[in-house]
């Protein structure tokens, strides 16, 4: 094999795997998880299966070749493909080493994910890669811990997990010592603190007042969803919404549609938010990444404006083939176009270079998703070809608010606050994860 110099945070999980069945590789985006994973399993004689989104195949192939490894020992399957195979062969992982990229995708225990989780119990060695082990709920991590342990160590049902470890009324964690013991030595944790090889970044919160078309559509959804199309008394301030008191199903549906209109009204082709984003795009510097959870009311709307301004761009979404995705990323990294528009489905496993601006068009339910998106542009060596004074990424988070006369909280503002509160709680939970990691126990001096 070629003499790749592994970093200390990569050597520890590789060493850990010599005497253990598996580990969750919870390392920052851009920390070299792919390389760590392939070295961790290549030291054994088992054939190696890699499972991941189609966008991660090239990164694995490139790293395997860079390391001078025998690529014939590796077989790559997308999540979709492995689910099809498991329908006829549940023992495919027996006597195999398995790497699962973006392993948080297994958090939802639907039928196909249960197939994968159950089948992975037969693997001889297992490495689960994720920069975001908790996406929506704390029990997301339980599925991964159980796979690594090869047994049901933690409850995966959300209600039971919360009953054991989370007090919803006070938003505090409980039974921390029990949780610590369940997590002990199942996770390798590493957070990037390198200030030399990574670009600096600065975040900017940009609030934009909605126009009258957005306000009218907002009223429509309030009446249709929250009041079920019943007549609303004239003296009721329909914009005064206590989101926390709404039934969860109704609240989630309402927030989903209002997040979309916060970008642009259905009957419009632009909005104050779109126009303000365009000002930053036109001014540069390039290249620029734009993220939206929505296609029609986000990515596509902005693409039309870019066309009108004759600004070069490409789109990465769930509809883009692997070959085309690789070509787009390569062209972006070589400065062949100015703006990259990415959707939620297209945001995983991208390795972007020299990005100067990242725009988050609307808030997300969970801060971890946004952190993951930003991490695609802030990576080890991502700006190394630029002069030192140009190695900076400006991050713009866009929030639509009501005009002053309404004095109410918009859906964007509510989601931003909710995401921040969940992040504060997650930080406490995350500290338990860190304390239980192999770095603080198995390798503790």
Swiss-Prot record:
ATP binds at residues 27-34. It is an enzyme of class 3 (hydrolase). Residues 14-151 form the Helicase ATP-binding domain. It is found in: Virion. InterPro entries: Helicase_ATP-bd, Helicase_C-like, P-loop_NTPase, SNF2/RAD54-like_C, SNF2_N. Keywords: ATP-binding, Helicase, Hydrolase, Nucleotide-binding, Virion. One of its GO terms (cellular component) is virion component. It catalyses: ATP + H2O = ADP + phosphate + H(+). Pfam families: Helicase_C, SNF2-rel_dom. One of its GO terms (molecular function) is DNA endonuclease activity. A motif (DEAH box) lies at residues 101-104. Belongs to the DEAD box helicase family. DEAH subfamily. This is Putative ATP-dependent RNA helicase L538. It comes from Acanthamoeba polyphaga mimivirus (APMV).
């Amino acid at each position: 094999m070629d003499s790749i110099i592994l970093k200390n945070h990569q050597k520890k999980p590789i060493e850990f795997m010599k005497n253990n069945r598996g580990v969750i590789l919870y390392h920052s985006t851009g920390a070299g998880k792919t390389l760590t994973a392939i070295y961790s399993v290549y030291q054994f004689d088992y054939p190696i299966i890699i499972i991941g989104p189609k966008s991660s195949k090239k990164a694995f192939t490139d790293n395997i070749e860079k390391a001078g490894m025998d690529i014939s020992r590796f077989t790559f399957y997308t999540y979709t493909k492995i689910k099809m195979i498991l329908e006829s062969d549940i023992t495919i992982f027996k006597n195999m080493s398995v790497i699962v990229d973006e392993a948080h995708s297994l958090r939802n225990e639907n039928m196909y994910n249960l197939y994968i989780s159950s089948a992975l119990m037969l693997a001889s060695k297992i490495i689960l890669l994720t920069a975001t082990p908790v996406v929506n709920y704390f029990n997301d991590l339980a599925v991964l811990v159980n796979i690594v342990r090869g047994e049901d160590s933690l409850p995966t049902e959300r209600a039971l997990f919360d009953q054991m470890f989370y007090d919803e009324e006070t938003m505090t964690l409980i039974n921390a010592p029990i949780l610590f013991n369940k997590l002990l030595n199942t996770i390798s944790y590493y957070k990037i603190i390198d200030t030399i090889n990574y670009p600096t970044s600065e975040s900017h919160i940009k609030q934009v007042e909605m126009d009258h078309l957005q306000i009218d559509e907002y009223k429509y959804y309030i009446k249709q969803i929250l009041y079920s199309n019943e007549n609303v008394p004239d003296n009721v301030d329909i914009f005064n919404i206590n989101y926390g008191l709404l039934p969860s199903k109704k609240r989630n549906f309402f927030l989903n549609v209002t997040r979309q209109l916060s970008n642009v009204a259905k009957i419009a082709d632009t909005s104050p938010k779109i126009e303000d984003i365009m000002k930053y795009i036109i001014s540069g510097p390039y290249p620029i990444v734009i993220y939206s959870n929505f296609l029609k009311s986000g990515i596509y709307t902005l693409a039309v404006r870019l066309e009108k301004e004759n600004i070069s761009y490409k789109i990465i979404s769930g509809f883009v083939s692997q070959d085309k995705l690789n070509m787009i990323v390569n062209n972006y990294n070589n400065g062949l176009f100015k703006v990259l528009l990415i959707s939620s489905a297209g945001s995983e496993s991208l390795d972007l270079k020299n990005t100067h601006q990242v725009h988050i068009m609307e808030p997300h339910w969970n801060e971890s998703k946004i952190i993951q998106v930003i991490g695609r542009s802030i990576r080890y060596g991502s700006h190394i070809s630029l002069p030192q004074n140009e190695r900076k990424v400006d991050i713009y988070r866009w929030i639509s608010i009501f005009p002053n006369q309404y004095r109410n909280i918009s859906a964007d503002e509510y989601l931003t606050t909710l995401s921040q509160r969940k992040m504060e709680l997650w930080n406490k939970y995350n500290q338990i994860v860190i304390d239980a990691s192999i770095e603080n126990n198995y390798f503790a001096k």
